[in-house]
Structures are given as C-alpha cells and as structure tokens.
Amino acid sequence: MINALAAADRLIIPTQAEPLALHGQDGMVRTGEMVERSRRRPLPISILPTLFDRRTRAGNESLRTMQDRHGTRVWEDAIPIDTRISNAAGLTLPSVGEDYPGRGLAAYRRALNWILGEDARALEQAA
C-alpha cells in the first residue's frame, strides 16, 4: 500500500459517517502525510464522507468531527445512504444506470466533479 501511495497523485479517503470509522480515517490521513514527507512532494488528501444518514445524531456528529479535524480536505457535502446502491454492492451487481434518479448517484456525481475540480486547481498552481 505504501508504494501505491508513493506513486499516487491524490489520496481519496472515503469514510463512513460513523464514530468508529473516524479512527481509521485519522490513521489514513497520518499515513498520507508520512508518505508526503518521505517523497518530498505534495500528496493532496481528500476525504469523502459516505453512508451519511442525516436522521441520526451519530451521523451528523461524525460529519462535523471530520470537518473540524480536517477542514477543507473534507468534501462539503456527503454521500447519503442509498439502499439501492447498498443492495447492489452486496450482490456484486451494477447498482444504477444513467437513468437512476437516486440521491446517492447524484451525490457521487457531485463528488466526482469536486475531485476533478481539486485536481484542476492543483495543476494550475503547479504551472
């Protein structure tokens, strides 16, 4: 895993919006920062909150904790729980088609645009 991180242009850490997941996320951030120091060039780190349930206190507090700890590294939105995506993953089937109107797919599209925008900004700064 370390060799892959050393060769990477970006580290994206998808993190379930639950308290226990925050421990693993913090470890991945520390590992990314260690790799960045050893390779002597930036390794942009992006944190993507996933499986977010806005109805629960644990989900809301976990999202706030991510934002407090990691600031602009955290996507300002979150991927909501989407049962169709979860069920399809369990069956190893494609979850959605282009015509699927679910909130989960729309959030993944916004996340992709955010990541691509971050990469474009990084390229502009490097030039």
What is each model feature region?
Residues 115-123:
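Short, hydrophobic alpha-helical segments
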Residues 87-110:
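C-terminal boundary of histidine-terminating zinc-finger modules
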Residues 39, 92, 116-117:
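Glycine-centered secondary-structure boundary/capping sites
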Residues 73, 109-112:
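H/E-rich (His + Asp/Glu) clusters that bind or coordinate divalent metals
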Residues 126-127:
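C-terminal accessory region of SF2 helicases/translocases
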Residues 1-77, 83:
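Conserved catalytic-core segment of NTP-binding enzymes
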Residues 33-36, 112, 116:
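Generic structural signal for well-ordered alpha-helical scaffold segments
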